[in-house]
Amino acid sequence: MIEQVLHYWYYVLPAFIIFHWIVSAIHTNSLRRKLGAKPFTHTQLDGFYGFKFGRDFLKAKRIGRQVDLINSRFPDDIDTFSSYTFGNHVIFTRDPENIKALLATQFNDFSLGGRIKFFKPLLGYGIFTLDGEGWKHSRAMLRPQFAREQLPMSPSLEPHFNVKAYPQEQRWVFDIQELFFRFTVDSATEFLFGESVNSLKSASIGCDEETELEERKKFAEAFNKAQEYISTRVALQQLYWFVNNSEFKECNEIVHKFTNYYVQKALDATPEELEKQSGYVFLYELVKQTRDPNVLRDHHSISLLAGRDTTAGLLSFAVFELARNPHIWAKLREDVESQFGLGEESRIEEITFESLKRCEYLKAVMNETLRLHPSVPRNARFALKDTTLPRGGGPDGKDPILVRKMSCSIFISGTQIDPKHYGKDAKLFRPERWFESSTRNLGWAYLPFNGGPRICLGQQFALTEAGYILVRLAQSFDTLELKPDTEYLTKISHLTMCLFGAFVKMD
């Protein structure tokens, strides 16, 4: 009996698969004709349904080379291709026209897909994880908190720029990214919660020791570790549920406990106390809009991620590039000297949002850093319906392609080093390019802070904070040097940060 059943399925199952493939192909061709699309110009097969590429990506992720791996899949003449990753059909693109469609002109055709499932254990429900009305409500709630009048200024930032924290002996080589992490978490927690965690006041970096809550000591490590797990969940796509071990859960609990401490403190404050609060406090303003502790916690976890990691990454790579290009560092110091003075003649009180905008070379340095090391090197969208993207089909890749409820991987990092947009020296750190006519109309070929309706609310906050620190470093130090034999900084995958730190000498 069993042999008869097996014999039956031996013929039926292959026949069903072939029949399904034929029907699917006919339907796909019909949709292409209906929507005016063409077959993909380029298709890359990476083992059985992309499991080989998925394995290679996870291996590259461990050594900080995942951005390089994806870049290697884009020869100069290919901007869009079809492939598979862990069984999921994915469109990879760095074409500005496709990116514009995904993020703006066809915004309603696409969603974040599985992001909520990947991110929820750490970040909950918020502006980074929600679609539709939930996202609109979250964005409307957060938008006023990043108004120009709330941007960080000298009085709020200077206490966190503790020059004593920067080893100043030539023989000292230290990880400046660690200091930038501490600076950004200090300034972010003061902005968000009304009080800084004062992580720069740590005996381990030569400053005054201070007693801290146990949660404060554990928070940064737990936050970093949880993000590593999140990035692996994203890489695994539909297999994300494999990554849910006890360490991941413990890290999430530590982060939530840290945030809940401040949320409860704000909820316990009376309306009169909230009104009398001196200075602007992000959390206290949100408490006026909602009393839901989970909503408050999720918004603050997401804001802390954005406020800490992206700015620290921008500063770390800016210093890395300046340290290996002494002539650019010298030119930046000249720009800073003309605007704010150097050394003992520094005019710190004059560093404002408006005055930083006048430092043209400083802006060029930050633009170039974000071009080569964008804070979010890759992004993704999922098609909500059968639709098209403008390019990637036909004999030359210029015709529309059909997108059938599938994932689209947006590779901003690849776009921003493409010679078609930035010339033959696209991979070279050269701030002067931002004074040339070729960079005046880049459009969707330069997206350091995303684009379309989801453009980053905190971009001016990040640029002001990073600009302030670069000015203060230029005022305080004559030279920057890299750790010997440092030619490349490995990167983590979820945001552009240095996997093993950024080691420099300063004098």
UniProtKB/Swiss-Prot annotation:
Enzyme's top EC category: oxidoreductase
Molecular-function GO terms, alphabetical: heme binding; iron ion binding; oxidoreductase activity, acting on paired donors, with incorporation or reduction of molecular oxygen, reduced flavin or flavoprotein as one donor, and incorporation of one atom of oxygen
PROSITE patterns to which the protein is assigned, alphabetical: CYTOCHROME_P450
GO cellular component: membrane
InterPro entries, alphabetized: Cyt_P450, Cyt_P450_CS, Cyt_P450_E_CYP52_ascomycetes, Cyt_P450_E_CYP52_fungi, Cyt_P450_E_grp-II, Cyt_P450_sf
CDD domains to which the protein is assigned, alphabetical: CYP52
Cited SUPFAM superfamilies: Cytochrome P450
Any Pfam family: p450
Stretches that traverse the bilayer: 6-26
Domain of life according to the entry: Eukaryota
Topology of this chain in the membrane: Single-pass membrane protein
Cofactor: heme
Binding positions (heme): 456
Keyword set, alphabetical order: Heme, Iron, Membrane, Metal-binding, Monooxygenase, Oxidoreductase, Transmembrane, Transmembrane helix
Function: Together with an NADPH cytochrome P450 the enzyme system catalyzes the terminal hydroxylation as the first step in the assimilation of alkanes and fatty acids. Preferentially hydroxylates lauric acid.
Homology family: Belongs to the cytochrome P450 family.
Cross-referenced PANTHER family: P450, PUTATIVE (EUROFUNG)-RELATED (PTHR24287:SF1)
Name the UniProt record assigns to this protein: Cytochrome P450 52A7
Gene field: CYP52A7
